[in-house]
Structures are given as structure tokens and as C-alpha cells.
């Protein structure tokens, strides 16, 4: 990446997988798969970019977590998904504290239910209506809603923000 573009100003850790399993259905392989992609992936990719950002004394790392981490479950993810996404919150806050003196900001975005190719085929119109009724803004989020939060974190508008969590859930979870 650096060879092609010369520098990295922002890293967005946005990998994740989910499995709709109950607690007692989760096997080691399933647990490892979800945590490896979400949590270990966030750590390893960050470690790959941090030396470059430290050399430049500048950078922004934005990590995708989930409302599932904050409320202890979601519509599609199992407990291991919630745990992985909660781990990202803790990791990002620890990274913000450690990397701040190096001029590197680290923040999280916690999307709620977002209409994507993953969720699109799993929700009937009746389900969408029922879920939307419980969201104060009255709709399921879009990829653009989430992208806006990441764009903000990539910009100078967030130059004095680190260790923060931006909820993008239409009010699905208010705390």
C-alpha cells in the first residue's frame, strides 16, 4: 500500500464476520474464526501501519465495532460476535492512550443495524418495519451513514478526538 500511495493518513479496520449462534452452540473453531477476523485482524493491521504513522507523527486509526458490543447482542450475531466487537472497543481505547503521544488518533464507530448485502437478504419487509419502529429515527441505517462517521474521523474536523466511540444507530441504543 505504501509503495503505491507513498503514505497512509488513515487506517480503517472494518473486517468482521458473524454467526447467528446461541452461547452453547459456539465451538472453538467458530469462536476462533469470529475473534480472529474482528479482533486479531484489528490488532495485526494496526501493528502493520503504526510504525509508518509514528515516523510521520500523524495518523488516524478508526475501528469498526458494533452496537452489539454495547448491548450484549444483536439481531444477527452470536455472543462471540459481541465479545469480539467489545474487544475492539477496549483495544482501540488502549491504542488511543498509547499512541496519542505519537500524534496518532484512535477511535471507534459502532454501527447499529445497517442495510448491506449481508443483512439485506435476511430481513423481510415485515421485519424491517418492526425493527424500524424501535429506532427513534425510524429507519435502518445505510452504508453511507457509517461511511460519514469514518470520513469525519479521517478528516481534520476530528483532529482533537481520540479514544472516542461514535454511535451510528439512529438511536437504537442511547446511553
Language model segments and positions:
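Active-site helix of classical SDR
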Residues: 46, 84, 92
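Short C-terminal tail/terminal secondary-structure segment
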Residues: 150-151, 162-175
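Substrate-binding pocket helix/loop in short-chain dehydrogenase/reductase
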Residues: 22-23, 30-35, 131
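Conserved amphipathic alpha-helix within the SDR
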Residues: 1-6
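A conserved structural motif in NAD(P)-dependent oxidoreductases
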Residues: 135-146, 157
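Alpha-helical segment proximal to the catalytic Tyr-Lys
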Residues: 51, 93, 97-101, 159
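Residue(s) in the substrate-gating loop at a strand-loop-helix junction
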Residues: 66
Amino acid at each position: 500500500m505504501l509503495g503505491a500511495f507513498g503514505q497512509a493518513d488513515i487506517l480503517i479496520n472494518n473486517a468482521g464476520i458473524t454467526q447467528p449462534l446461541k452461547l452453547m452452540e459456539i465451538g472453538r473453531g467458530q469462536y476462533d474464526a469470529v475473534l480472529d477476523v474482528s479482533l486479531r485482524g484489528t490488532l495485526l493491521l494496526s501493528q502493520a501501519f503504526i510504525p509508518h504513522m509514528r515516523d510521520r507523527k500523524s495518523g488516524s486509526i478508526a475501528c469498526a465495532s458494533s452496537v452489539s458490543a454495547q448491548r450484549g447482542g444483536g439481531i444477527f450475531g452470536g455472543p462471540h460476535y459481541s465479545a469480539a466487537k467489545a474487544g475492539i472497543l477496549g483495544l482501540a481505547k488502549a491504542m488511543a492512550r498509547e499512541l496519542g503521544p505519537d500524534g496518532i488518533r484512535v477511535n471507534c464507530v459502532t454501527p447499529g443495524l445497517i442495510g448491506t448485502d449481508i443483512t439485506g437478504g435476511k430481513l423481510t419487509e415485515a421485519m424491517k418495519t418492526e425493527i424500524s419502529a424501535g429506532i427513534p429515527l425510524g429507519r435502518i441505517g445505510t452504508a453511507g451513514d457509517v461511511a460519514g462517521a469514518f470520513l469525519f474521523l479521517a478528516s481534520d474536523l476530528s483532529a482533537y478526538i481520540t479514544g472516542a466511540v461514535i454511535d451510528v444507530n439512529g438511536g437504537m441504543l442511547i446511553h
